[in-house]
């Protein structure tokens, strides 16, 4: 049978609605950086459906800056990025949850590029990219940016048997967050929340995170501000590894990844 009747009996594929996008930005007393970050988010080629700013107990006007920019403000009284980030992910209403920090400088196509990548790869649960430390001397900043990205990507990847997400520039599916939200160490301020989240995402679904070298953002190089800051970051990394390796050893994580790759 041909003609309109046949077309009605065998309709074409129903278009899939584009995923909605939430951007989560934790902040603590960082109003000036936050203002610049929100201005860049407002100029995206694919505007986010919402921006959620998590005020982690600021004493400056960070919350007022967020509201003035049209962001939804969530208050998280428990200090620490793990608690603040988790509160933002919980509050996000989008199908995709994008994360950056108040000092992140995103390019104009940041949300568009991320949304397109997730649309093209249904099995993808998490996506991340590199950063450039914009507050460092030019040559030194390039060296530090490349070294930091390589160390985090490869050392972190070996530790968790997959690609680690970087909190200044990452995204995940809301359904993936819901699957691990009760497992992450959200109430421990002494862990790296992004690495901890990566451990749990990859335990939930091995080989489900990716690194996009073109998804580059600017970030403040606060890590290099003092020796104390670097020591503190190192201790947090050790704590994050210890907690997650106690749940599942590195060897077993790699076994699970190989098994996942071998499945048809």
Stretches found by the model and what they are:
Residues 1-40:
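N-proximal low-complexity "stem/linker" segments adjacent to membrane-targeting elements
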Residues 33, 40, 55-63, 104:
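A conserved acidic beta->alpha catalytic loop
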Residues 39-48:
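Short, acidic, metal-binding catalytic loop of nucleotide-sugar glycosyltransferases
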Residues 76-92:
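Glycine-rich, basic loop-to-helix element that forms the pyrophosphate-binding segment
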Residues 97:
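Short aromatic/hydrophobic "clamp" motif used to bind/position activated sugar donors
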Residues 109-140:
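Conserved donor NDP-sugar-binding/catalytic core segment of glycosyltransferases
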Residues 129-134, 142-163:
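Short, flexible, basic/aromatic active-site loop/helix in glycosyltransferases
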Residues 188-197:
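Acidic donor-binding loop at a coil-to-helix junction in glycosyltransferase catalytic cores
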């Amino acid at each position: 049978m041909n003609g309109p009747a046949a077309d009605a009996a065998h309709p074409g594929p129903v278009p899939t609605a584009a995923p909605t996008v939430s951007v989560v930005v934790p902040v603590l007393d960082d109003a000036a950086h936050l203002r610049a970050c929100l201005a860049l988010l407002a100029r995206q080629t694919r505007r986010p459906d919402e921006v959620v700013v998590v005020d982690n107990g600021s004493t400056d006007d960070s919350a007022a800056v967020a509201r003035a920019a049209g962001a939804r403000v969530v208050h998280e009284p428990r200090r620490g990025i793990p608690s603040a980030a988790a509160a933002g992910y919980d509050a996000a209403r989008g199908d995709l949850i994008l994360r950056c920090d108040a000092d992140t400088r995103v390019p104009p196509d940041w949300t568009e590029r991320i949304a397109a990548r997730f649309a093209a790869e249904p099995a993808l649960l998490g996506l991340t990219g590199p950063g450039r430390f914009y507050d460092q001397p030019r040559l030194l900043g390039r060296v530090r940016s490349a070294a930091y990205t390589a160390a985090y990507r490869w050392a972190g990847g070996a530790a968790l048997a997959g690609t680690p997400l970087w909190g200044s520039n990452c995204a995940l599916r809301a359904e993936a967050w819901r699957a691990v939200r009760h497992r992450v160490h959200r109430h421990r301020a002494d862990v790296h929340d992004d690495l901890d989240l990566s451990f749990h995402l990859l335990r939930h679904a091995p080989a489900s995170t990716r690194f996009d070298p073109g998804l580059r953002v600017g970030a403040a190089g606060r890590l290099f501000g003092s020796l104390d800051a670097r020591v503190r970051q190192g201790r947090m990394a050790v704590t994050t590894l210890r907690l997650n390796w106690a749940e599942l050893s590195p060897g077993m994580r790699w076994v699970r990844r190989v098994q996942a790759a071998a499945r048809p």
